[in-house]
Amino acid sequence: ANASVATTGGAYSVFQNAASSLFSHNLFEVGFSYSPWMRDVKKGYDLMAFGGFYSFNHKHSISFGTRFYREPKLNPDDEEYPFIPKDENNNPIVGIEAFRPLSVSADLAYSYRIGRYLGLSVTARYIRSSYGELFTNNALGFDVAAYARIPLNRMLEGAWVSAGAKISDFGFTFDDSNYDLPTKF
């Protein structure tokens, strides 16, 4: 139930379905967004994205993007963050300093158009999540996607329908981690 895999291509299509960039009216797009995320809950959450693509005559395209997510500063004695290590008396382990959790991803995709109505893409994504000195996770994930845009000229002049499919986040982690990438279709 992720409708964004079938939306029209744009600067941020690398994050949803890079093949859709082949059907954009533009040969080049770039975009930047910043959102002070969840500011009604607690200040300090930042979400930024930078993305774009370059299409070679709507037959091949290269897409790129990076996302940056930062949480508020955490102190070792914060009660609302149970993952901070505690000793047997439930006190924060000495030596842990305040930190600000950070997640960064960098995406690079190649897309190829097959015929007039179908495009395919493959995306590689490097992901790094850091929780100060506590732990850091690094992963490499891949997406494979298809995007189809079919005109409905016989019924409605100038109208079209689009469909998309994607297998995302299959890959591996680099670190000794108990976490796996959440592969989904």
Predicted stretch roles:
Residues 1-185:
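Subset of outer-membrane beta-barrel
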